[in-house]
UniProtKB/Swiss-Prot annotation:
<feature type="binding site">
    <location>
        <position position="333"/>
    </location>
    <ligand>
        <name>[CaMn4O5] cluster</name>
    </ligand>
</feature>
<feature type="binding site">
    <location>
        <position position="272"/>
    </location>
    <ligand>
        <name>Fe cation</name>
    </ligand>
</feature>
<feature type="transmembrane region" description="Helical">
    <location>
        <begin position="29"/>
        <end position="46"/>
    </location>
</feature>
<dbReference type="GO" id="GO:0009635">
    <property type="term" value="P:response to herbicide"/>
</dbReference>
<dbReference type="GO" id="GO:0009535">
    <property type="term" value="C:chloroplast thylakoid membrane"/>
</dbReference>
<keyword id="KW-0934">Plastid</keyword>
<feature type="binding site" description="axial binding residue">
    <location>
        <position position="118"/>
    </location>
    <ligand>
        <name>chlorophyll a ChlzD1</name>
    </ligand>
</feature>
<feature type="binding site" description="axial binding residue">
    <location>
        <position position="198"/>
    </location>
    <ligand>
        <name>chlorophyll a PD1</name>
    </ligand>
</feature>
<keyword id="KW-0157">Chromophore</keyword>
<keyword id="KW-0106">Calcium</keyword>
<comment type="similarity">
    <text>Belongs to the reaction center PufL/M/PsbA/D family.</text>
</comment>
<keyword id="KW-1133">Transmembrane helix</keyword>
<feature type="binding site">
    <location>
        <position position="344"/>
    </location>
    <ligand>
        <name>[CaMn4O5] cluster</name>
    </ligand>
</feature>
<comment type="function">
    <text>Photosystem II (PSII) is a light-driven water:plastoquinone oxidoreductase that uses light energy to abstract electrons from H(2)O, generating O(2) and a proton gradient subsequently used for ATP formation. It consists of a core antenna complex that captures photons, and an electron transfer chain that converts photonic excitation into a charge separation. The D1/D2 (PsbA/PsbD) reaction center heterodimer binds P680, the primary electron donor of PSII as well as several subsequent electron acceptors.</text>
</comment>
<dbReference type="GO" id="GO:0009523">
    <property type="term" value="C:photosystem II"/>
</dbReference>
<dbReference type="GO" id="GO:0005506">
    <property type="term" value="F:iron ion binding"/>
</dbReference>
<feature type="transmembrane region" description="Helical">
    <location>
        <begin position="142"/>
        <end position="156"/>
    </location>
</feature>
């Protein structure tokens, strides 16, 4: 018997690091995108928690009227928020080193930019990490494609909309009531409820919820029983089993008779692709709608579109919505402008037909 001895080539530290980063055997996959995702998301999360608890008031409108958003300044979980950067900063990149002091940076809302930019980098890297892990495991890339919808939505409200409006102060506040305020002001300024892409997004989200509930209830109702009546049907499933866990023929027959035959899928793969596609497509369209309205390509305007034979306006729901929009428009940033643009854009009306006589 002959034994052959070979000198083992040394593996460099960099090669071992690369193997560890890209290994699918780790309990938590890191990946090259993870090298960017973990630090950015940790930074955004840490800054958000600190700012939500203790950040001082921010001069959001740039008119020396600070708005308090943190818990230590009198807010609660519902009313609290990280206030967007000041309108005095606009779209300027505003890291800590650009301010004269940390106090100035906090007063002008610097934490908002720090959180938003790190968050967007983090979620984009998370999306890339999904693709990377799918590639390593030989899977198809649809998980990454589906997650692109919420990434597009977040990018629209946190980055594209401020770019279009010219200031980070128009971005969505990082809080519950701040989100509601953003929605109301968005409706007042852009009539988003009358935008077709927003309508598609509503159909996507609510339709996706409906289809998810329908699919889950159909599957749960047609499970193949593997247990006794005294045991949970969940115990009849073994992880990784090859057999079907529910009777798709029974589910197809039930739903086909409940609605009509062709409303029911007879292909499980096509069904699940549809369940993924519907909400993703809706959220994509909503993000596109926000991005177009960012540059003031607004929703449909049907105001005063119905008149009688005498030319008098017959109000429709469009006019009712417009009246609500005007109310929200004049109420927000009430000290930032003395004459809102929407109210100043009508025809000039004469206040006197003749000039008064002036006696010398």
């Amino acid at each position: 018997m002959i034994a052959t001895l070979e000198r083992r080539e040394g593996v460099s530290l960099w090669e071992r690091f690369c193997a560890w980063i890209t290994s699918t055997e780790n309990r938590l996959y890191i990946g090259w995108f993870g090298c960017l995702m973990f630090p950015t998301l940790l930074t955004a999360t840490s800054c958000f928690i600190i700012a939500f608890i203790a950040a001082p008031p921010v001069d959001i409108d740039g008119i020396r009227e600070p708005v308090a958003g943190s818990l230590l300044y009198g807010n609660n979980i519902i009313s609290g928020a990280v206030i967007p950067s000041s309108n005095a900063i606009g779209m300027h990149f505003y890291p800590i080193w650009e301010a004269a002091s940390v106090d100035e940076w906090l007063y002008n809302g610097g934490p908002y930019q720090l959180i938003v930019l790190h968050f967007l980098l983090g979620v984009a890297s998370y999306m890339g990490r999904e693709w990377e892990l799918s590639y390593r495991l030989g899977m198809r890339p649809w998980i990454f494609v589906a997650f692109s919808a919420p990434v597009a939505a977040a990018s629209a409200v946190f980055l594209v909309y401020p770019i279009g409006q010219g200031s980070f102060s128009d971005g969505m506040p990082l809080g519950i009531s701040g989100t509601f305020n953003f929605m109301l002001v968005f409706q007042a300024e852009h009539n988003i409820l009358m935008h077709p892409f927003h309508m598609a997004g509503v159909a996507g989200v609510f339709g996706g919820s409906l289809f998810s509930a329908m699919h889950g209830s159909l599957v749960t109702s047609s499970l193949i029983r593997e247990t006794t009546e005294n045991e949970s049907t969940n115990y009849g499933y073994k992880f990784g089993q090859e057999e079907e866990t529910y009777n798709i023929v029974a589910a197809h027959g039930y739903f086909g008779r409940l609605i009509f035959q062709y409303a029911s899928f007879n292909n499980s793969r096509a069904l699940h692709f549809f369940l993924a596609l519907w909400p993703v497509l809706g959220i994509w369209l909503t993000a596109m709608g926000i991005s177009t309205m960012a540059f003031n390509l607004n929703g449909f305007n049907f105001n005063q579109s119905v008149v009688d034979s005498q030319g008098r306006v017959i109000n429709t729901w469009a006019d009712i919505i417009n009246r609500a929009d005007l109310g929200m428009e004049v109420m927000h940033e009430r000290n930032a402008h003395n004459f809102p643009l929407d109210l100043a854009s009508g025809d000039v009306l004469p206040v006197a037909f003749t000039a008064p006589a002036v006696n010398a």
